Amino acid sequence: MKIKFEENLKYQLEAIKSITDIFRGQEINRNVFTIESTHENQIFGKVENYFGIENGLLLHKEDILDNLNKIQTKNGLEKTKDINKSNYNFSVEMETGTGKTYVYLRTIMELNKNYGFTKFIIVVPSIAIKEGVYKTLEITKDHFKLLYDNLPYDYFIYDSKKIDTIRNFAVSDNLQIMIINIDSFNKDSNVINQERDQANGYRPIEYIKQCNPIIIVDEPQNMESENAKKAISQLNPLCTLRYSATHRDKYNQVFKLDSIDAYENQLVKQIEVSTIELINNTNTDYIKLQSIKLTKTGINATVEL
């Protein structure tokens, strides 16, 4: 059984465009970098070089800020006053159940189509989310190939036992999507941060840094510690795209679809909570009739509350 995906949901297209328009004016620019083997890997004095492909950004920060402010104005969000390369974080708020994962995966495809960006890393806080993202990539494969004219792309879950996938990520000129758990690269003891023979004597993270990848952070509120922020910044991102329904910090927010918006647009169902009524409950208001007296002016009753 194949799942059919709706490709023209207005709010999803708006969320995608709110990211892609940040780079309006960017020309396709693929930069090449050289990876040189270390001395230990040289054979008979011959140096074996590899050529990697990195994301290249031509826009200045003033261009990014101008594009960002136009998006924020259009979407009724607070305008960012200043921005710099170290602060290229952009937040998308989407209510649970509205297709957040689909949106950021399709955003990847659009960024590749429009600007030629090829290196993307999806950072997740847990194994469950990691497996969920990979599954979504599997079931959307035919859908995206149809939408994007059989665009060739590779996706994989980072595995510390398969370091060669990092080198392939760096040298491939096809669209590359890596999924990685934050715990796999936020400590010095992680394999990715250590020199390895499989990586020609380099630390595998050095390959990633040279790629200048676009980072997508899924559920960033779970990765707001200083250690997590430092780890993500060491990937040398071109920019960081943050997707959640419950952001702790909304860095340069570009799109908002909260629970109220989702309900008003009939994207999620309303939950009704019924009141609880106890049967045979003796814990009710107490009243006791003490006496009744007939008088000339009427009837008097004495009660105990």
Residue ranges and their predicted role:
Residues 1-305:
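RecA-like P-loop NTPase motor core of helicase/translocase proteins
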